[in-house]
Amino acid sequence: TCDICREEDPERATILEFNADSSGRRVFATGLRNAVGLALHPVTNELWATNNGHDREGRSLPPEWIDIMRDGDFMGYPLVHSHQVWNDFEIEPYQRILPITDADRTLATRHKRPVALVPAHYAPMGIHFYTGNQFPTRYKNAAFVAFRAGKAKLSSHPGYMVSALFSTPDGSNATIAPFITGFQAGTTQDDVWGFPVGMISDDAGS
């Protein structure tokens, strides 16, 4: 997808669902600008996703999100972010969205509050649910999320870390905390030596 625009292809900025034999192709969820990480929750088997927001609304907007994807969901792009907060269409490149229609306003009311919001431009990548026993009990079924960007790019926050997302299986009562940090030694892009992207657990639970 583009930074913010009205997609001409109805399958852009979506999640598509297929049967195991590749038949039954259909749009499952819409309004995802850049959903990089996808994972099934080990308890509920629901699909979770990470999303990267647009870039021209400053260092603090919009927040990135992690959320559960359910059939028919509208996740906000290209109209709103956070929870039904309109994007800034006074920014010149975003004016191509205008005019905002009644259909847009109705669609925006379907935008749900995400399980978790994190600082703008953190660039959440992979999401991995931990089912091992190597870590303390609270990590069982928690989600590890990799963030490959932060302050050295556009964000006003450090970033460049792997965080642990704790919540109930339905996504409520979510909290997020750093798990692995130290990939950024200073404040510039040259000071970043690691860009976390994906994670996996081994049979030993590490």
Regions found by a protein language model. Give the residues of each.
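Beta-propeller domain segments
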Residues: 2-6, 10-23, 33-34, 39-194, ...
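Blade-level signature of beta-propeller repeat domains, shared across WD40, Kelch, NHL, RCC1
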Residues: 200-206
